[in-house]
């Protein structure tokens, strides 16, 4: 389970089940021009891309492992 939590007072939390990451990454790969091959991606690289994209949406998010 990947948990993204806001460092602000809002205490927003977003939990992403590992099984959904591939589907999410396919959508993200379209956003970044399709250069990211999700089939060949290792889990760490996928999490890094996901967190990086979430940070683009809201810079107050950080990864809480």
UniProtKB/Swiss-Prot annotation:
Organism encoding this protein: Mus musculus (Mouse)
Protein name from the UniProt record: Putative per-hexamer repeat protein 2
Domain of life from the UniProt record: Eukaryota
């Amino acid at each position: 389970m990947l948990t993204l939590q806001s460092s602000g007072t809002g205490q927003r939390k977003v939990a992403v089940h590992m099984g959904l990451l591939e589907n999410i990454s396919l959508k993200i790969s379209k956003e970044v021009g399709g250069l990211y091959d999700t089939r060949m991606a290792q889990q760490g690289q996928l999490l890094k891309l996901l967190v990086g994209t979430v940070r683009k949406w809201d810079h107050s998010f950080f990864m809480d492992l």
